[in-house]
């Protein structure tokens, strides 16, 4: 099993694949004229606009659900792993993939809004929907929905719950079995409450956990502020093989930085579009901009917080390709949350293990919530027009079982399975958004045109020549009749 998964990951995450992902993000950046810079202010403004409705959630709730998926163990364990095997230069490549990935997140989330539907009284959308309605290739849409369902329900929850269990056992001595039981009870309470309960939980937990984590990192940075020039220099020199110690790791720095960056911020992965489609907005681009900014929050803020805590304190190990250590400050500590714990303990003795365990719990738990929502959306797609009550119940039980199983299985297998699930989804979604870039670009131009006229943009797909955007055609007709 482990050998097969390793072989699959070697193909899904080979070096040419990574460069292709970078190239696609850069191409979208050029096509949108680097909207991630031009519309930075608008991204922030749109986060707090819009209200929830019976069918949809507010922009902030959609952002919170998306961030609950983006901000997970990758922000703590993933960053540490990238530094361990790619050196400090991997941090730069995580930043790079976030910057250009914001354009990919914009495209996929705008597409999710354009082709969303109102199904069973709720807004639904995502890659499966825009593949079928935008490309007209139903088998491809079904393939993505099936892949997403398998990844989100079976493969990915274990990565998160495993990290929670390991952190809690290390900090408080509580067995993984007990942690697993507690996780299942709490998760069950939330997911059996439906989308609204997930949205409400996310909007309460996510801001609290992200701000608290970033504040602690700022305290550590201030206490080690004299190291700032050296750390920034080390990151940039290591990223481009200009540092003598890390010069031989440039390929690994790019590979680990991009892989862990994508794993963390999910830009182009096809997960963010699901909550994006649920937002109640007057124009698809509004939510596209919000989701682009969520990539910044995840990587430039939260991942950077972890990286800076580790690098400012020097609490990390980095291995060369032959297994020898280039940096070996933490003997006997495996790459992962232990780096962050040691970094915090070096400044605030005795505080590291407990804080990281609590942070991991919140980060990972909300991510599992998001996984459920994504899996539920894809079941809704596959079951359209048919009774899905029992399928939804089965999904809830499966994701609860996968979460429990993850607490007691090995971390290496958990991460390998997670990488495989992510890799499959990335490739199916990337093919789709490359082929469907035009509708998203047309929507962006339309939005910018209306903003220049001083209007609050509304969306008329027919005027732009965008077909099969049935929800928006009805919405525009209804709005026109209301105004007239």
Curated annotation (Swiss-Prot):
Residue stretches spanning the membrane: 11-31, 66-88, 92-114, 139-159, 172-192, 205-225, 238-258, 292-312, 350-370, 390-410, 416-436
Localization in the cell: Cell membrane
Record has Signal as a keyword: no
Cell membrane is among the record's keywords: yes
Annotated InterPro entries: Na/Ala_symport (IPR001463)
Membrane topology summary: Multi-pass membrane protein
Disulfide bond annotation, renumbered to this chain: none
GO molecular function: amino acid:sodium symporter activity
Keywords tagged on the record: Amino-acid transport, Cell membrane, Ion transport, Membrane, Sodium, Sodium transport, Symport, Transmembrane, Transmembrane helix, Transport
Gene Ontology annotations for the cellular component aspect, listed alphabetically: plasma membrane
Family per similarity comment: Belongs to the alanine or glycine:cation symporter (AGCS) (TC 2.A.25) family.
Record's protein name: Putative sodium/proton-dependent alanine carrier protein YrbD
Organism: Bacillus subtilis (strain 168)
Gene responsible for this protein: yrbD
